[in-house]
Amino acid sequence: MSSSPSPSPSSSSSSSASSSASSSPSSSSKLTWLDIRSVGEARAAIVQEALHHRVEALVADDPAHLADLPPTVAKVLLVVGKQIPEEFGEATVVVVDPSKHGVTPAELALKHPEIEFGRFVEIIDAPTLEDACESSRTEKWSVLLFRDPTKIPLEIVIAAAARASGSMVTIAQDLEEAEILFGVLEHGSDGVMMAPKTVGDAAELKRIAEAGIPNLNLTELRVVETSHIGMGERACVDTTTHFGEDEGILVGSHSKGMILCVSETHPLPYMPTRPFRVNAGAIHSYTLGRDERTNYLSELKTGSKLTAVDIKGNTRLVTVGRVKIETRPLISIDAEAPDGRRVNLILQDDWHVRVLGPGGTVLNSTELKPGDTVLGYLPVEDRHVGYPINEFCLEK
């Protein structure tokens, strides 16, 4: 399930969907199809916005509405509730409903080899769910409309098409549903088709599709000093995620330097493991949230997004379930990067609070000493209300 639609019509195989991917997002990118069938007078503005944000495809039911579009966007003709037109105009992909039209995409492809064809399936019961599974396994393009709000049928289709080479595009009713569709079964639909309600929706749909966060280059930091600093408030961050043993969140007193704090995944002598929790540090500390923005631990709450990081720098977005702020004894840890930059982290002064070192070594906060090595991250930008910005800012 990894094709990208051809951006322009071609009579040669060299412009097929797979070979045209170089001018589109990579095969791992989520596809965004914008449905302009019912946008009315706002069509021109919405189309321009979609082109500006490089939406992969525009979808219409009239070939005339696909005319004069640039070759940077795929032109999808979705024929639902009407007869298949005799001419497809500039359409590069045509999607039909074999149950209504009495003709299959394969049969149409024999007559029009220059066009890619797909199948539309509306899922309302078990037989149509099986149709969707079959389409996703065999067709180059499957456009799926799930009438019920449950996502279990989509999970079944995704699993059925796991080894398929075609692409599945699921219709979303709004931006909130689009975000959910992209994440079902941790894989999500290959693409989402949505009818915009207003100018701005195309940009937001594209942002949601590209919400994957970049991996980070972690740095080995040498501990230079630790000190017991008395009582203060620290935050335990309980997420809705099961962390890996080599995974945690980045926390630091300054926005330009953070240390990788591990979750309570590793066994403890006096309590069960809590792999969803990171005992993260003093409440003034920064952590890394969505879109490379920093957040104070004190401002996190149910529903907040955080960047989880493993020892190789692989990242994923996780959701906060709750934050517990309590008064505890604190320990300050100062570490230094190879280039001399200093990093500070203030943690609860207790043996069971841990950070990660090279190779996933688990280091208890109370046992850290000068010369020990921990893993950290050194952003280069200063911050303004959490966002990275190039300006002068001295933190100490």
Swiss-Prot record:
EC number of the protein: 4.1.99.20
A Pfam family the protein falls into: DHQS
Biological process per Gene Ontology, one example term: amino acid biosynthetic process
UniProt pH dependence: Optimum pH is 6.5-10.5.
Cofactor requirements of the protein: Mn(2+); Co(2+); Fe(2+); Mg(2+)
Regulation: Partially inhibited by 0.1 mM pyridoxal phosphate.
Temperature dependence: Optimum temperature is 30 degrees Celsius.
Catalytic activity: 2-amino-4,5-dihydroxy-6-oxo-7-(phosphooxy)heptanoate = 3-amino-4-hydroxybenzoate + phosphate + 2 H2O + H(+)
MF terms in GO: 3-dehydroquinate synthase activity; oxidoreductase activity
Function: Catalyzes the cyclization of 2-amino-4,5-dihydroxy-6-one-heptanoic acid-7-phosphate to yield 3-amino-4-hydroxybenzoic acid (3,4-AHBA).
Family that this chain belongs to: Belongs to the archaeal-type DHQ synthase family. GriH subfamily.
The name this protein goes by in its record: 3-amino-4-hydroxybenzoic acid synthase
Gene coding for it: griH
